[in-house]
């Protein structure tokens, strides 16, 4: 029995959300999705009991977007545990370290159960690390005791547990999509709306763009200091969204023919953004984790220690700048940010293609198994692999570079919701549009539903 089997066996002992006996209607699934979204926003506004009020907030935008989290609340850990668990298992499966066929229902069942156990383990670990590491008591005269640690850790763990079950509700078919995608989209949308209309009472009444225009309509709105939303960021946001929608619609088509039905020809469309948002997402997760560790080290080592200062300097240069003013004020940071994110995005892009089974060899094997071949060439995996290699690796490099460049430019010019957030949000909206369109088609034409073997509650 392997590790995945042990984790799956443990996971099956936990309470689970039952799958609907028959597929719910689209409106019912939308209603469930709306309920989950409302619960997410409620949890994002319930502060943790037992921590100093002044230590609620202060979260870096990148962390808030990547993990759909809200500092000092029940959503402090956000989707971090479940995303980390999922990525680890997918990487191990893709690297063939763990043998698991995700195309097989039994393999998917094991994956889901193992992911739940691993996510709960990460939730418990992060909850303890946040509290014992002094995350909520840094800079205060309060000396927390064991009861304080236990109380806050329990709240963090319960918040993460609810997120895991929210995702299970969605994944089992009660809602549409996944809770992970839904929460990321909600967080990005909230950030964009806040940048346009937000105010911070007693600190910055004119924080958002609209309040700033009303209070002080002059040329300073083109570029504001301290990372405040400005007109440059607003127009950058619009341009980034339009460009992302266009790029995600682009395809590179490879001509194919059917071996079973001679004379039938078609094309296999490869997304121009072949690696989608995965490389830049992995870069964002890496930098977010480094920022998280920085906060924990501040308590253990002290902000004056040499080791902490070296570490915080590295994290500072890897973190995205907050708008045009900061980018110009610190050109060295901007240059390091551009170089590091570009290189890491390309490296992660190639890694993901190999790990996720998107490389030429595995794609060729899939086409051969499907009875497909390229016109004028032998139906040989090695021949097909050589042809696909001319498409896939250049697409991997180019798409990783383009995605990184778009996110970097968006961050430098202060796009609302961050460049990474906009990239994720546009991709998620595209997925939701496709899912809802499909569901509406199935409800409009019941015959399609019967062909697919689906029933309505």
From Swiss-Prot:
Transmembrane regions listed in the UniProt entry: 21-47, 60-88, 110-134, 147-171, 179-197, 230-251, 277-298, 333-352, 396-414, 418-432
Gene Ontology CC: plasma membrane
Protein name per UniProt: Protein translocase subunit SecY
Subcellular location per the Swiss-Prot or TrEMBL entry: Cell membrane
Keywords, sorted A to Z: Cell membrane, Membrane, Protein transport, Translocation, Transmembrane, Transmembrane helix, Transport
All ranges on the Cytoplasmic side of the membrane: 1-20, 89-109, 172-178, 252-276, 353-395, 433-457
PANTHER family: SECY/SEC61-ALPHA FAMILY MEMBER
Intramembrane stretches: 60-67, 68-79, 80-88
Alphabetical list of InterPro entries matching this protein: SecY, SecY/SEC61-alpha, SecY_CS, SecY_dom_sf, Translocon_Sec61/SecY_plug_dom
PROSITE patterns reported for this sequence: SECY_1
Topology relative to the membrane: Multi-pass membrane protein
Extracellular-side positions: 48-59, 135-146, 198-229, 299-332, 415-417
Quaternary structure and interacting proteins, as annotated: Component of the Sec protein translocase complex. Heterotrimer consisting of alpha (SecY), beta (SecG) and gamma (SecE) subunits. The heterotrimers can form oligomers, although 1 heterotrimer is thought to be able to translocate proteins. Interacts with the ribosome. May interact with SecDF, and other proteins may be involved.
Gene Ontology biological process terms in this record: intracellular protein transmembrane transport; protein targeting
């Amino acid at each position: 029995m392997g590790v995945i089997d042990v984790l799956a066996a443990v996971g099956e002992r936990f309470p689970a959300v039952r799958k609907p006996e028959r597929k719910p209607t689209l409106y019912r699934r939308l209603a469930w999705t709306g309920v989950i979204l409302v619960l997410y926003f409620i949890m994002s506004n319930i502060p943790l009991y037992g921590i100093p009020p002044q230590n609620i907030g202060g979260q870096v935008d990148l962390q808030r977007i990547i993990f759909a989290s809200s500092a000092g609340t029940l959503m402090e850990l956000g989707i971090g545990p479940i995303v980390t668990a999922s990525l680890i298992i997918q990487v191990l499966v893709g690297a063939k370290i763990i043998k698991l066929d995700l195309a097989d229902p039994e393999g998917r069942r094991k994956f889901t159960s193992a992911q739940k156990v691993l996510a709960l383990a990460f939730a418990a670990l992060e909850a303890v690390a946040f509290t014992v590491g002094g995350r909520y008591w840094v800079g205060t005269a309060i000396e927390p005791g064991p009861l304080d640690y236990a109380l806050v850790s329990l709240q963090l763990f319960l918040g993460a547990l609810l997120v895991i079950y929210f995702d299970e509700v969605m994944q089992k078919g009660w809602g549409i999509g996944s809770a992970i995608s839904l929460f990321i989209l909600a967080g990005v949308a909230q950030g964009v709306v806040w940048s346009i209309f937000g105010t911070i009472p007693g600190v910055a009444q004119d924080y958002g763009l609209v309040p700033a225009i009303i209070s002080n309509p002059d040329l300073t709105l083109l570029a504001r200091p301290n990372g405040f939303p400005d007109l440059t960021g607003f127009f950058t946001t619009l341009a980034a969204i339009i460009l992302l929608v266009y790029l995600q619609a682009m395809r590179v088509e490879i001509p194919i023919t059917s071996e079973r039905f001679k004379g039938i020809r078609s094309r296999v469309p490869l997304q121009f953004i072949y690696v989608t948002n995965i490389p830049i997402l992995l870069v964002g997760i890496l930098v977010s984790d480094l920022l998280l560790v920085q906060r924990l080290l501040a308590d253990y080592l002290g902000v004056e220690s040499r080791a902490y200062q070296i570490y915080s300097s590295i994290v500072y240069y890897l973190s995205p700048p907050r708008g045009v003013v900061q980018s110009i004020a610190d050109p060295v940071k901007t240059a390091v940010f551009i170089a590091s994110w570009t290189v890491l995005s390309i490296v992660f892009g190639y890694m993901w293609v190999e790990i996720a089974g998107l490389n030429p060899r595995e794609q060729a094997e899939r086409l051969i198994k499907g009875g497909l071949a390229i016109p004028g060439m032998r139906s040989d995996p090695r021949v097909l692999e050589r042809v696909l290699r001319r498409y896939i690796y250049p697409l991997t490099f180019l798409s990783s570079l383009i995605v990184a460049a778009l996110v970097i430019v968006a961050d430098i010019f202060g796009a609302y919701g961050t460049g990474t957030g906009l990239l994720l949000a546009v991709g998620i909206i595209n997925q939701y549009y496709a899912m809802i369109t499909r569901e509406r088609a199935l409800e409009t034409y019941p015959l399609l539903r019967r062909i697919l073997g689906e029933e309505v509650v």
